Amino acid sequence: MFGCLGNFAYLCKSLQTNKTMKQEINPKDTNRAIAFELWTKSSMPMVTLTKTFDVTRLRKVSRKRGLKFNMLLCWCIGRAVSKIDEFYMLPQRQPTDDGTSEMEWKLYKYDRMAINVIADNVKGGLSFCDVAVSDDLETFNANYMHLTETITQTCQDILDDEAVIVGTSAVTGTELDSIVNQYSGIFINPFLAWGRYHKGWLKTTLPISFQFHHAQMDGKHAARFLEELQRIIHSI
């Protein structure tokens, strides 16, 4: 009982701290105007880039400090995406303003981000939670551990509808060269996926696949994010 009340108080505190809202913006007033016009009409607007990362430092910190490798990687991802302006904008299909059943593409701007994490729950299924991006590792780790433990036990997702979400998926049952996600037309947020890291003689490597909607960003923005992610991993 007290555990449930504690979880409820935690969620209420988080909601009180984050009362900001996403805002609809005119694509023509942004640097995504042409891309938005072109790629929201495409039958396949998603792009996947795969880069092999040197995660030697990440693995050492994980072992030395007793922190989860996946948590550390998600923290690094959050720090990297927060430095790229294009991540704060996301196209979405929404009902038209005339009240009909028609749908249209709109562009939204967010002022905060969260990392979506998937966890195995006690019923043998999967549960999801959104962990707020933070520059502070201890804060992020506390939120990550609390939320993943909560969804594991309750089998109830904890999601943040007012943050731009960066999806993640760790398929650690095997080493993988690349993961290509399918486009459903529903889940269009940025998405990173990886398998098991490879332990070599001198370094540990991990291929990470990054999928994004081309209306949201171009290849140069994605490349800058991947370079920034590697830099942050090295500097942790």
PLM region spans:
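Small-residue-rich loop/turn and linker elements
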Residues: F87-D130, E162
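Acyl activation and transfer enzymes in specialized metabolism, enriched
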Residues: L58-I84, L206-F225
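Flexible, Gly/Pro-enriched loop and linker segments at secondary-structure and domain junctions
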Residues: K22-T50, N70, A163-T205
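Helical lid/core segments from catalytic subdomains that handle acyl or acyl-like groups
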Residues: A119-T174
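Short, positively charged and aromatic/hydrophobic N-terminal segments
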Residues: N7-T17
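Active-site-proximal acidic secondary-structure segment that organizes catalysis
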Residues: E138, I186-I236
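Acyl/amide activation-and-transfer machinery of modular secondary-metabolite enzymes
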Residues: K41-K60, D111-D135, T205-Q211
